[in-house]
């Protein structure tokens, strides 16, 4: 991207850093990962989990959620002020799974938030270590992106459910900072802005007074984040219009919906980071690996290497396929929910299949599910090759895609053509070209019209053998262009509900 020079790298966002060189970035990301690992080891000790139970992804999710809840200032304050029956605002907890006489049992644990915060800070040299908290939020977000297609959320705001490839990070909390903003898709930002504008339409005081001023600042900041994701001047100019509007209303909602659609072809830059569950970092630290000393990157070979040697287990329901559960988690670990399945399959070395064909539900187990029939199995999270994660939309071109999803958002920097259904997308652009933004709209539509399906994105970029740590010998894969590339194809994925 042209403005790359003014941007901080993800690692800098991740670690709240000022400009750092590559070694310093690797060290500070390593420090963050090491902190998560140390915290996890300590929590396993507190909860008396044995090695196997500590590597169970469901236990990892509960422990991660406990620390995120302990540090959720706004919610904690809200809970203190609005006490609800049977909920202690000072406590946090969740289901912990243990093996008792050859059967898996669920045990609900409860801890003081203060105690959890103490353990977390102790593991992070006394710091609050917000970067580590954000890292866990992004892992949860990537898992949600892989598990659920946000059809309802899209429809509610008047967008097409087939635009799901724009929805990365849609379940990230607002407090996820710059690192969180970097991984949010164009659709996610548009959704947040539309919700805000709708509130303003319904509530006359939304933009008024001292609170209204803060709201306005937040609105403009979100507009700027979204503007920064677009790669064409016309899209950015339209964002300026939306941001500068005196009184945001339906015209702005229309402009935003238009921009979201345009992003299916003129894709935005969305960062991708491999964020792994805490139960991967814990055992690595326990085995004596020093992340800070060795350095770590979320966008290079490191997460692949870590997953090659990690043992992670998962509870499996009686009608689920363990291989399918593994695929779900592999995609989440690599932030590949909206990647082309041809590319994911090549990197993983086994066929990655669409969501609707997976016999697996989400990773979390609901409190009313029967534990008697639960078994556990090893998650297969290894890969055949590794590839660099991209933060660009890889725009040059396009191609046909599927019924359930009409575009993709690339994760890996690997040469290929990008599938999307041009006729379907362009059909949405008939009619309405009047109003303030008509010239920009016309220009955007022209760029979309001229996009050529045959062109190749990420020219010359390839995948690498796992032994090729320096990324010296790229292997440029060739893909069957006629093949289907979308994950949420024809979709019967579950709906995500908070």
Curated annotation (Swiss-Prot):
Post-translational modification: Late in virus-infected cells, may be cleaved from a 56-kDa protein to a 53-kDa protein by a cellular caspase. This cleavage might be a marker for the onset of apoptosis in infected cells or have a specific function in virus host interaction.
A Pfam match: Flu_NP
Keyword set includes RNA-binding: yes
Protein keywords: Capsid protein, Helical capsid protein, Host nucleus, Host-virus interaction, Ribonucleoprotein, RNA-binding, Viral nucleoprotein, Viral penetration into host nucleus, Virion, Virus entry into host cell
InterPro entries, per database record: Flu_NP (IPR002141)
The keyword Cell division is annotated on this UniProt entry: no
Basic and acidic residues bias spans: 8-21
Motif stretch (Unconventional nuclear localization signal): 1-18
GO molecular function: RNA binding; structural molecule activity
Motif Bipartite nuclear localization signal, chain ranges: 198-216
Region called Disordered, residue ranges: 1-21
Parts of the chain that traverse the membrane: none
Subcellular location: Virion; Host nucleus
GO cellular component: helical viral capsid; host cell; host cell nucleus; ribonucleoprotein complex; viral nucleocapsid
Major localization class: virion
Function, as annotated: Encapsidates the negative strand viral RNA, protecting it from nucleases. The encapsidated genomic RNA is termed the ribonucleoprotein (RNP) and serves as template for transcription and replication. The RNP needs to be localized in the host nucleus to start an infectious cycle, but is too large to diffuse through the nuclear pore complex. NP comprises at least 2 nuclear localization signals that are responsible for the active RNP import into the nucleus through cellular importin alpha/beta pathway.
Family affiliation: Belongs to the influenza viruses nucleoprotein family.
Assembly, per entry: Homomultimerizes to form the nucleocapsid. May bind host exportin-1/XPO1. Binds to viral genomic RNA. Protein-RNA contacts are mediated by a combination of electrostatic interactions between positively charged residues and the phosphate backbone and planar interactions between aromatic side chains and bases.
Protein name as it appears in the record: Nucleoprotein
Organism of provenance: Influenza A virus (strain A/India/6263/1980 H1N1)
């Amino acid at each position: 991207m042209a403005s790359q020079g003014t941007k901080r790298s993800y690692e800098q966002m991740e670690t709240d850093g000022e400009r750092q060189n590559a070694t310093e970035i690797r060290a500070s990301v390593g420090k963050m990962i090491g902190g998560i690992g140390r915290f996890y080891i300590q929590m396993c000790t507190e909860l008396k989990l044995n090695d196997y139970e500590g590597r169970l992804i469901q236990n990892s999710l509960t422990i991660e959620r406990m620390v995120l809840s302990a540090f959720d200032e706004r919610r904690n304050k809200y809970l203190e002020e609005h006490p609800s029956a049977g909920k202690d605002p000072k406590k946090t907890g969740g289901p912990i799974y243990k093996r008792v006489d050859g059967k898996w049992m669920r045990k609900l644990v409860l801890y003081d938030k203060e105690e959890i915060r103490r353990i977390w800070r102790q593991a992070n040299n006394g710091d609050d270590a917000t970067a580590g908290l954000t890292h866990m939020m992004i892992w949860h977000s990537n898992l949600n992106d892989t598990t659920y297609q946000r059809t309802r959320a899209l429809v509610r705001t008047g967008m097409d459910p087939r635009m799901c490839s724009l929805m990365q990070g849609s379940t990230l909390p607002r407090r996820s900072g710059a690192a969180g903003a970097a991984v949010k898709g164009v659709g996610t930002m548009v959704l947040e802005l539309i919700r805000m504008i709708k509130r303003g339409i319904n509530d006359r005081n939304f933009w008024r007074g001292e609170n209204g001023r803060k709201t306005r600042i937040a609105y403009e900041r979100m507009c700027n984040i979204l503007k920064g994701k677009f790669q064409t001047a016309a899209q950015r100019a339209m964002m300026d219009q939306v941001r500068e509007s005196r009184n945001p209303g339906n015209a702005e909602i229309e402009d935003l919906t238009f921009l979201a659609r345009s992003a299916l072809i003129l894709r935005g830059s969305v960062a991708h980071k491999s964020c792994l569950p805490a139960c991967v970092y814990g055992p690595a630290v326990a085995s004596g690996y020093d992340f800070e000393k060795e350095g770590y990157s979320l966008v290079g070979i490191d997460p692949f290497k870590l997953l090659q040697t990690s043992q992670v287990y998962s509870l499996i329901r009686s009608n689920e396929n363990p291989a399918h559960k593994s695929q779900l988690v592999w995609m989440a670990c690599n932030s590949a929910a909206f990647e082309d399945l041809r590319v994911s399959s090549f990197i993983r070395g086994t066929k990655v299949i669409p969501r609707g064909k997976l016999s697996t539900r989400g990773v979390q187990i609901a409190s009313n599910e029967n534990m008697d029939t639960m078994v556990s199995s090893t998650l297969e999270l290894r890969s055949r090759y590794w590839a660099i994660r991209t933060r660009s939309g890889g725009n040059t071109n396009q191609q046909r895609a599927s019924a359930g999803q009409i575009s993709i958002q690339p994760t890996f920097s690997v040469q290929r053509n990008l599938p999307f259904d041009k006729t379907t997308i362009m059909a949405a652009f008939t009619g309405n070209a009047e109003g303030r933004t008509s010239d920009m709209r016309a220009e955007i539509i022209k760029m979309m019209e001229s996009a050529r399906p045959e062109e190749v994105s990420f020219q010359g970029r390839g995948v690498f053998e796992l032994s090729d740590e320096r990324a010296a010998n790229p292997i440029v894969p060739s893909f069957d262009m006629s093949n289907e590339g979308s994950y949420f194809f024809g979709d019967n994925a579950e709906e995500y509900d908070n």
